[in-house]
Amino acid sequence: MLIIGKKLSPYALLSISGLLAASDQAVKWLVQQSMAYGEYVSVTPFFNWVHLWNTGAAFSLFANGGGWQRYFFIGIAVVVSIFLIKLILENRHKGEAIAYSLILGGAMGNLIDRVFRGYVVDSFDFYWRDWHWPAFNLADIAIVLGALLFVSSSLLGKKANTNAEPDGSD
């Protein structure tokens, strides 16, 4: 069951994270099996399906670091994942709990890549004319959506708290 009382089931939230990580790995496997490194397939006038590797962080930050970044980002991902699992188990607010679940799923998907491949496989390339957004993957999408959900639920939660009338209890 997804909802227990007013809380979301931590097992459902962790299952969502696992499903996201597994889906991310399935897409990456498909890309690696069907395309050579550096290959791209034009899908629309603004989107390519690509096979690229990223040894760095978002936007290839630290990609030319010489190898240390693999272990650094593995360590960061493990610490963040443990923290997110703790937050999911506490499950204070539904929107935030779902956000943590999305971020955890994305972090796990990219962590698996870093541990077993030494790099993250990217497959989505959006562009306009000659300008390309940095390539990304399903895990990155989950992380960004989770971050946006966290910010919006936090802001909406604060707005709801400021609009609530005092109940007279001190």
From Swiss-Prot:
Signal peptide range in chain numbering: none
Transmembrane segments: 71-91, 97-116, 131-151
Catalytic activity: Release of signal peptides from bacterial membrane prolipoproteins. Hydrolyzes -Xaa-Yaa-Zaa-|-(S,diacylglyceryl)Cys-, in which Xaa is hydrophobic (preferably Leu), and Yaa (Ala or Ser) and Zaa (Gly or Ala) have small, neutral side chains
PROSITE patterns: SPASE_II
GO annotation, biological process: proteolysis
The organism's place on the tree of life at top rank: Bacteria
EC numbers, comma separated: 3.4.23.36
Molecular functions (GO terms): aspartic-type endopeptidase activity
Main location: membrane
Keywords tagged on the record: Aspartyl protease, Cell inner membrane, Cell membrane, Hydrolase, Membrane, Plasmid, Protease, Transmembrane, Transmembrane helix
GO cellular component, one term: plasma membrane
Disulfide bonds: none
Protein's pathway: Protein modification; lipoprotein biosynthesis (signal peptide cleavage)
Cross-referenced InterPro entries: Peptidase_A8
Catalytic residues identified in the record: D122, D140
UniProt membrane topology term: Multi-pass membrane protein
Location in or out of the cell: Cell inner membrane
Chain's role: This protein specifically catalyzes the removal of signal peptides from prolipoproteins.
HAMAP family: LspA
Family in the record: Belongs to the peptidase A8 family.
Protein name from the UniProt record: Lipoprotein signal peptidase
